[in-house]
Regions:
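ATP-dependent adenylation/nucleotidyltransferase module used to activate substrates
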Residues: 1-163, 231-243
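Generic alpha-helical secondary structure
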Residues: 9, 104, 186-193, 197, ...
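Mid-to-C-terminal catalytic subdomains of enzymes
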Residues: 117, 148-152, 158-209
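Short, flexible, solvent-exposed loop/turn segments with mixed acidic/basic and small polar residues
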Residues: 134-136, 207-210
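A structural signal for short secondary-structure junctions
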Residues: 210-212, 241
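A short interface-forming secondary-structure element
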Residues: 213-230
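Short proline/glycine- and acidic-rich turn/helix-capping motifs at secondary-structure junctions
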Residues: 245-250
Length: 250
C-alpha cells in the first residue's frame, strides 16, 4: 500500500530498516494501527509481532480491532494480560504510569523470550504537548515511538489508519479506567462502563460515562440532545447503576 504523500518513502525506509525483528504494542486505536501499517511496509511481516493487553481497562471493541488489523496484514497477534498493581487501583494522578509500566514490563518479557530487537508504540508527535505520566514508562523500557520520531501527528496517524483499514471503527479513545473518578478502580466499574458505552457509542460518538459518587455523562464532540435522548441515556445507565444520580452534560 502506498504511503500517504506527506511522508517521504526514503525517510520511512531509513527509519524502519534499522530494525530486523520488532514487537508493536497494538492497542486497537489509530496510532498503533498506523505504526503497524508503516512497519509492515519495510519490515518482513514474519519478523513483526503485534501484542495487545486484554485486561478489563481495554475496551473489547479495541481488542477486536487489534486482532482484525494484525490479521489483515498477515502479522502474528498475541493477546496478553497483566496483574494490576495496588498503585494502579488506588487511582491517583500516576495511574497511567503504573498501568503502562506493567504493560511494558510484560511486553519486554515477550521481547526477551522471543528474541525481538525492539518494541514500537503509538506515541505521536502531538503527545509531547500533553501531560502523559505513561511516557516515563516508555523511557524506562526503551520503547521506540516511530510516529514521534518521524514527526507524525495525531491527525496524520488517523488518516493512515482510516486509509489502511477501511472496515475498522477508529475512535479517539481513552481506557475504561479513566472513567472512574475520585474512587478506587474496580473490575466491576470498568465492566459496567464498557457495557453502557458499548450500547451508546455508535449512537453518541465520543460519549464518556464517568463513575464517582454519582454518574456524569460527557461528550467529546458537541451534541444536540432531545428529551427522548436524555430518557434513553438515563434508562441504559440505570440498568447498571440504579442507585446513582445521573448528570448529563451537553
Amino acid at each position: 500500500m502506498k504511503v500517504i504523500s506527506f511522508l517521504e518513502a526514503d525517510s520511512l525506509k531509513t527509519f524502519f530498516k534499522k530494525f530486523n525483528k520488532v514487537i508493536v504494542a497494538l492497542s486497537g486505536g489509530a496510532d498503533s494501527a498506523a505504526v503497524l501499517q508503516l512497519s509492515s511496509q519495510f519490515i518482513t511481516p514474519e519478523n513483526i509481532l503485534a501484542v495487545t493487553c486484554v485486561n478489563p481497562h481495554v475496551f473489547g471493541y479495541e481488542i477486536e480491532n487489534a486482532r482484525k488489523i494484525a490479521d489483515s496484514l498477515n502479522i502474528n497477534w498475541k493477546p496478553f494480560t497483566v496483574q494490576y498493581s495496588a498503585d494502579f487501583l488506588k487511582n491517583d494522578d500516576l495511574r497511567c504510569y503504573y498501568c503502562k509500566h506493567e504493560i511494558l514490563k510484560s511486553i519486554e518479557n515477550i521481547r526477551k523470550t522471543e528474541g525481538f530487537d525492539a518494541i514500537f508504540d503509538g506515541t505521536n508527535i502531538d503527545d509531547l504537548n500533553d501531560y502523559r505520566p505513561g511516557m516515563k514508562a516508555i523511557k524506562e523500557f526503551n520503547v521506540i515511538s516511530p510516529l514521534k520520531e518521524l514527526g507524525i501527528s495525531k491527525k496524520d496517524s488517523l488518516h493512515i489508519a482510516k486509509s489502511s483499514f477501511k472496515t475498522i471503527y477508529f475512535n479517539v479513545e481513552s481506557c475504561a479506567a479513566t472513567r472512574i473518578v475520585n474512587k478506587m478502580i474496580t473490575f466491576e466499574d470498568m465492566l459496567k462502563v464498557e457495557k453502557i458505552e458499548d450500547i451508546l457509542r455508535y449512537r453518541y460518538p465520543g460519549i464518556r460515562v464517568r463513575v464517582s459518587e454519582n454518574i456524569s455523562v460527557e461528550f467529546k464532540n458537541k451534541v444536540s440532545l432531545k428529551k427522548s435522548d436524555l430518557e434513553f441515556l438515563s434508562k441504559i445507565i440505570k440498568l447498571h447503576y440504579a442507585d446513582k444520580q445521573i448528570k448529563i452534560n451537553y
